[in-house]
């Protein structure tokens, strides 16, 4: 078995780690950074950019730069009304599916495809670092992700060419990292506030056992929302002062979003910061600039409702675990947004103790995923992970009521059955709607899928015995089976239909990704070839100038002609010619050294021949 990596596929940034020498290690990307921006962009010429390089050009290319895509993955139209307003790119909805428009390619992408590009970048860089091709991974998801979001994340891995061995919850992964070497039993609360999601989990940790007691969260709450509060404040203030709505200008909106994020980060260490955006817009009177001072107090005032929302899952998780705050031994902070001082103060107020800050909030989840990867690969022994399902699962019964079969916070993997009957006489079939959520009525919960059991024996209402079995695997992904006891007729559904992508689409995207991999590699090779050739031209000109009086006229003319040819091929992008001429030019540059050495030798010999040695002779007597 090759190396199995652990991946934290984040809303803002992503991290990849692996077990090396029995220790989890974060793998730096090709640029040397330990985190990779979860951003994908396409240039006007169709080139794909992933990571920090994509983020850097977002202001000049807002419609083709895709960020925070994790907030759309596995979701349907009616679930993204809040998030859709916060992006500078165009999110399309058709029926229940979500697509991201890419004007540069005149193409629409599924969120899973964009996430797959980030995963592919992480895995390619890891393969280079490890010296072997990585094909297997453990990927983390927010604990409060529902079934469709988990399945969509797995689909993204598949599109990226990965065999996703396990999907695990981010707080659980963080606990693996925190508690790996802990011998004593501790009750910990993991507070995970990332860029787009928020989770709280309560766990018992110690002596190799990691048992999740409860989990709660909000998949519509994260650092992006804190940024958005600043953005909306700036837009409102500018409109009042200048009469211009910056929210309608995609480029201005992208600049505001970046400035808001920067201000939020700076206010974690400073009590005030400046937002300066020159030439934010223009009127007939000339350019307009945005200058604003933001204090930490103002930021906390703008985000007070979000900070209050963060306390709700904490209280719910404690309640579900049947614990008082005083029972918590340690609070582990995860996610970049936990650096906000008001968040740390809120956690301290709720739990009654200072949060433990011994772990890196940006890397702890990926490190924990690497530990789980090590367990699956057989590299890590004596670890038992007992996770839970975050939301209740059940079926629709008479009157539009949700009947729960597996309650939330049930340890997984698990399997449970319930026997139901019919509500009418002699039905030829029954339709079973699978639901996820905590509300009493079907309409208030999420429908994961519907399937039909045919061939039921004619019988009065209440007589047929239909056994419905729910089976949740270690990834938290559900399959459901219905069986009519009298006839033995059986029907099952794996809730992959909960994914927003049909199976055929996933397979098509996998194929496209494989085809594009070769194209991307060729583009990368061409860029490298071009850069090397331009550098070679510069070096050649420099050497000709430096050794002008020491090389033959013929060699000088030959090199100058090759430089001209190479520059011409570079302009025409004739990559085969570029490689061929580059090789000839390199050989010619080697001749410079030989030529110069021969000239040096001749000069030295000539000097020796011309030298007259003066001395005194005495007459011998």
Curated annotation (Swiss-Prot):
Residues 596-621 are annotated as: Disordered. Disulfide bonds: none annotated. SUPFAM superfamilies: Actin-like ATPase domain, Heat shock protein 70kD (HSP70), peptide-binding domain. Residues 611-621 have a biased composition (Acidic residues). CDD domains: ASKHA_NBD_HSP70_DnaK-like. GO terms for molecular function: ATP binding; ATP-dependent protein folding chaperone; unfolded protein binding. GO terms for cellular component: chloroplast. Its main location: plastid. Residues 600-610 have a biased composition (Basic and acidic residues). The keyword Chaperone applies. It is found in: Plastid, Chloroplast. InterPro entries: ATPase_NBD, Chaperone_DnaK, Heat_shock_70_CS, HSP70_C_sf, HSP70_peptide-bd_sf, Hsp_70_fam. Keywords: ATP-binding, Chaperone, Chloroplast, Nucleotide-binding, Plastid. PANTHER family: HEAT SHOCK PROTEIN 70KDA. Acts as a chaperone. HAMAP family: DnaK. Belongs to the heat shock protein 70 family. This is Chaperone protein dnaK. It comes from Pyropia yezoensis. The gene is dnaK.
């Amino acid at each position: 078995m090759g190396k199995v990596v652990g991946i934290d596929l984040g809303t803002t940034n992503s991290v990849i780690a692996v077990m090396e020498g029995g220790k989890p290690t974060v793998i730096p990307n090709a640029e040397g950074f330990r985190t990779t921006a979860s951003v994908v962009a396409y240039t006007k010429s169709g080139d794909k950019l992933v990571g920090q390089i994509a983020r850097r050009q977002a202001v000049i290319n807002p419609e083709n730069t895709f960020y925070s895509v994790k907030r759309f993955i596995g979701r349907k139209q009616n679930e993204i009304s809040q998030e859709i307003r916060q992006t500078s790119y165009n999110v399309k909805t058709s029926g229940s599916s979500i697509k991201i428009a890419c004007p540069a390619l005149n193409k629409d992408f599924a969120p899973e495809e964009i996430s797959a590009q980030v995963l592919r970048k992480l895995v390619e860089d890891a393969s280079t670092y490890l010296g072997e091709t990585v094909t297997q991974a453990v990927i983390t998801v927010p604990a409060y992700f529902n079934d469709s979001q988990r399945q969509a994340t797995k689909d993204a891995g598949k599109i990226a060419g990965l065999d996703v061995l396990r999907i695990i919850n981010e707080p659980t992964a963080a606990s693996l990292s925190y508690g790996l070497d802990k011998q004593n039993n501790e009750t910990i609360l993991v507070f995970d506030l990332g860029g787009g999601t928020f989770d709280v989990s309560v766990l018992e940790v110690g002596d190799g056992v990691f048992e999740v007691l409860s989990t709660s969260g909000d998949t519509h709450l994260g650092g992006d929302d804190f940024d958005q509060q600043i953005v909306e404040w700036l837009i409102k203030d500018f409109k009042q002062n200048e009469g211009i709505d910056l929210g309608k200008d995609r480029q201005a909106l992208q600049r505001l979003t970046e400035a808001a994020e920067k201000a939020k980060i700076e206010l974690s260490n400073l009590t005030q910061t400046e937002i300066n955006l020159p030439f934010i817009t223009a009127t007939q009177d000339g350019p307009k600039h945005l200058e604003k001072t933001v204090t930490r107090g103002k930021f906390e005032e703008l985000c007070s409702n979000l900070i209050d929302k963060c306390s709700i899952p904490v209280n719910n998780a404690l309640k579900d675990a049947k614990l008082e705050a005083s029972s918590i031994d340690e609070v582990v902070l995860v996610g970049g947004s936990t650096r906000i001082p008001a968040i740390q103060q809120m956690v301290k107020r709720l739990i009654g103790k200072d949060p433990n800050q011994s772990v890196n909030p940006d890397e702890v989840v990926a490190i924990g995923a690497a530990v789980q990867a090590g367990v699956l690969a057989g590299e890590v022994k004596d670890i038992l992970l007992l996770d839970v399902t975050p939301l209740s699962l059940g079926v629709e019964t008479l009157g539009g009521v949700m009947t729960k079969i597996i309650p939330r916070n049930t340890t997984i993997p698990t399997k449970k059955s319930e026997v139901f009957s019919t509500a009418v006489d002699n039905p030829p079939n029954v339709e079973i709607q699978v639901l996820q959520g905590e509300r009493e009525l079907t309409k208030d919960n999420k429908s994961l899928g519907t399937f039909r059991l045919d061939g039921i024996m004619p019988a009065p209402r209440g007589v047929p015995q239909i056994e419905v079995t729910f089976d949740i695997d270690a990834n938290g992904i559900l399959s459901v089976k219905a069986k009519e006891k009298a006839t033995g007729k059986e029907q099952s559904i794996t809730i992959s239909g909960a994914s927003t992508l049909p199976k055929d689409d996933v397979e098509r995207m996998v194929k496209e990704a494989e085809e594009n991999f070769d194209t991307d590699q060729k583009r990368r090779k061409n860029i490298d070839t071009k850069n090397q050739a331009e550098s070679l031209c510069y070096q050649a000109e420099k050497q000709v100038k430096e050794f002008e009086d020491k090389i033959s006229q013929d060699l000088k003319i030959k090199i100058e002609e090759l430089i001209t040819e190479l520059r011409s091929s570079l302009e025409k992008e004739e990559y085969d010619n570029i490689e061929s001429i580059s090789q000839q030019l390199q050989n010619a540059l080697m001749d410079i050294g030989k030529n110069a050495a021969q000239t040096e030798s001749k000069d030295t010999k000539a000097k020796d021949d011309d030298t007259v040695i003066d001395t005194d002779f005495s007459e011998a007597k």
